[in-house]
Amino acid sequence: VEAQWNSDLLLVDEIAKDLRSCLDGEGRPVFSFSVSYQNHGPYEWTYTANETYLDPKTSGLPEESCYVFNNYLHGANITISAMTLLAQQLEEMEEPVVLVLFGDHKPWGGNSNDAYYGIGASFDTTALEGFYQYYATPYLIWANSAAKETLGREFRGEGGDFSPCFLMPELFEQCGWTGPSFLQ
């Protein structure tokens, strides 16, 4: 995968480099909050820029929807490669490292979210299912082997549904930390 100017591949290299620099001889905890925008929309809706994942003829979706999803999925593929690389670099570290990844909103789905409606998504936020389809985003709490050993947890399984603003308290709970009361 080739890096572009705003690529997550460049971002994860900087994160790992900065983390190593902060940990050299310090022996203190390090907190890093990094925001990626490599795959932020809007996505091109008049053509597919790279790989074709969805084709109008085989998917039954309109061309514009296929273009939006194809361009989003290409970026998602780069992001997955970059985050996998970051996890591999963090796994090699002797220090305990816990990584939290989350999305803050759904990818752009075309004007008026037409691409989503084409795949049957309901964004009727007055209904619980529509609310979740519109607002829900995935998150991942991952730990390297050193953190698993230090914290005595495997960091496996599924977490609950909650707003990203509650990820810090969830992280504290998963790590067995108490911290300031405003983080609990």
Give each language-model segment a name.
Residues V1-Q184:
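Solvent-exposed soluble domains appended to multi-pass membrane proteins
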